[in-house]
């Protein structure tokens, strides 16, 4: 039997990892985002097959693991980052499997000599896991000659290149400024193999997310409240600073407060469980979005 006939049981190797469980959780926890889920599955497949090839002595350059997540706030970028760190850990590409989320303030100092120690300290904490840099484009401020963000980028570039077996970096933020950021920093762009775009949620998807959020907290929408919330989401999507699932969560928090005040103002009556669970249309319609 030649070495080329050496075999490996794919299903057995797949079952040894928890990738199926992680991908299923991703499907359950995140509404929509079909193209994102598809890309994560593709990356997981590549990493698994690469591992099997190595086990059989087939050598090739390690796949690029650094990633870019672009999209509006509240579209699941951090959640997907967490799942990606789980997949990388299960397949042995990172040693610890933790995800460290940071922003510019965690990396860049305010005076000379302050940035390098800050950035190196963050990198030290992230080693063996995934470093998730949110709104990464704020690292680069070309209009300010005294800005120290470029120093953090230089250190980051070195680590992404020289310690890629110990750390995976995910750069995240709005698509347009991220594209400009990469244009201005081609060294960063060339080190990122996986660019994933996160689409905004539709009204229907956001309504489904709302119901899931409420169910977790043992609330439910009445039929009229569901109609009102659908109208709210459609209107809110057209307003500035809309943050998808994050904006919906904030709206539901306010609806819960209005529900509590409505019930509180009717004290003296006997309350049923249904009344404590139900969010009514008026709890939604009191929002200033309807003014």
From Swiss-Prot:
The keyword Plastid appears for this protein: yes
UniProt subcellular location: Plastid, Chloroplast
Keyword entries, A-Z: ATP-binding, Chloroplast, Nucleotide-binding, Plastid
Gene Ontology MF terms: ATP binding; ATP hydrolysis activity
Pfam families according to UniProt: AAA, AAA_lid_6
Cellular component per GO, a single term: chloroplast
Binding site for ATP: 71-78
Function summary: Necessary for the expression of RuBisCO.
PANTHER family linked: AAA-TYPE ATPASE FAMILY PROTEIN / ANKYRIN REPEAT FAMILY PROTEIN, AAA-TYPE ATPASE FAMILY PROTEIN _ ANKYRIN REPEAT FAMILY PROTEIN
Family per record: Belongs to the CbxX/CfxQ family.
NCBIfam families, alphabetized: cbbX_cfxQ
Protein name: Protein CfxQ homolog
Name of the gene this protein is made from: cfxQ
């Amino acid at each position: 039997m030649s070495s080329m006939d050496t075999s490996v049981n794919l299903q057995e190797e797949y079952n040894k990892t928890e990738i199926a469980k992680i991908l299923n959780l991703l499907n359950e926890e995140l509404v929509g985002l079909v193209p994102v889920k598809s890309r994560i599955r593709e990356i997981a497949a590549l990493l698994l097959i690469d591992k099997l090839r190595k086990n059989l002595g087939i050598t090739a350059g390690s796949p690029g693991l650094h990633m870019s997540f672009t999209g509006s706030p509240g579209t699941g970028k951090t959640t997907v980052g967490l799942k990606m760190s789980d997949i990388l850990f299960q397949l042995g590409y990172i040693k610890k499997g933790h995800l460290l989320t940071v922003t510019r303030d965690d990396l860049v100092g305010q005076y000379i000599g302050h940035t390098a120690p800050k950035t190196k300290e963050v990198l030290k904490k992230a080693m063996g896991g995934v470093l998730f840099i949110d709104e990464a484009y704020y690292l680069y401020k070309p209009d300010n000659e005294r800005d120290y963000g470029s120093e953090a980028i230089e250190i980051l570039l070195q680590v992404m290149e020289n310690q890629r077996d110990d750390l995976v970096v995910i750069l995240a933020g709005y698509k347009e400024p991220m594209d400009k950021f990469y244009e201005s920093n081609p060294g960063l762009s060339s080190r990122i193999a996986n660019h994933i775009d996160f689409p905004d949620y539709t009204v229907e998807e956001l309504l489904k997310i709302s119901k899931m959020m409420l169910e977790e907290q043992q609330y439910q929408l009445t039929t009229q409240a569901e109609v009102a919330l659908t109208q709210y989401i459609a209107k809110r999507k057209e307003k500035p600073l809309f943050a998808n699932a994050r904006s919906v969560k904030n709206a539901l928090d306010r609806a819960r407060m209005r529900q509590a005040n409505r019930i509180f103002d009717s004290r003296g009556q006997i309350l049923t469980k249904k009344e404590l669970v139900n969010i009514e249309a008026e709890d939604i319609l009191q929002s200033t979005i309807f003014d």
